[in-house]
């Protein structure tokens, strides 16, 4: 088992929700990111034409599953579920400290909206709201994890999977985003 230690730092605010819908550092979004980038690495090693069944089987054996109907153990006995061989831990699951939002000075117009609104409202629609009668967006509820916050990230994984895991981690470092509105650049981290 190989163990690696990293520091994760957000470059843009992140909306990672706890059960109470407040911003909180949580490991599951980062594990989901690792799985997603692992799929990209798997596809790349198969000339971007992988057999999806083979990919899902390999993913399930590495990251755990409850869906593979054809999985067997070392003795050939059927395995209905398998736990992950990848272990992950965040240094802390602290709540976000960002409790207010400074609205952008830039305004945009849209044919379906009567007045020009702050441009960040479009990028953050959902986590950001526009209160009735206001021109400036506010955070919906709870706190967000603000840009610049960081925590320690520990990862343990089988040595034989190190090349693909480390390539996936490199892709996460370059392109990773997590949380609400991450497709719009929120939750960008290295």
Task: Cite the ranges covered by each PLM segment.
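Small/polar/charged residue-enriched interaction surfaces, especially the RNA/DNA-contacting tracks
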Residues: 1-190
């Amino acid at each position: 088992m190989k163990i690696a230690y990293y520091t994760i730092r957000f470059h843009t605010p992140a909306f990672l929700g706890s059960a109470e819908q407040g911003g909180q550092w949580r490991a599951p979004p980062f594990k989901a990111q690792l799985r997603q980038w692992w799929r990209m690495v798997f596809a790349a090693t198969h000339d971007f034409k992988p057999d999806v069944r083979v990919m899902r089987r390999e993913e399930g054996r590495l990251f755990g599953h409850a869906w593979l109907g054809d999985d067997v153990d070392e003795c050939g006995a059927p395995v209905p579920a398998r736990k992950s061989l990848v272990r992950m831990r965040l240094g802390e699951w602290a709540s976000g400290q960002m409790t207010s939002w400074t609205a952008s000075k830039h305004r945009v117009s849209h044919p379906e909206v009567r007045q020009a609104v702050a441009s960040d409202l479009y990028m953050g629609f959902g986590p950001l709201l526009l209160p009735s009668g206001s021109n400036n967006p506010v955070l919906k509820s709870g706190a967000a994890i603000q840009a610049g916050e960081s925590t320690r990230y520990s990862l343990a994984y089988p040595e034989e999977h190190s090349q693909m895991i480390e390539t996936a981690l490199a892709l996460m470092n370059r392109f990773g985003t997590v949380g609400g509105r991450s497709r719009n650049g929120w939750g960008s981290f290295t």
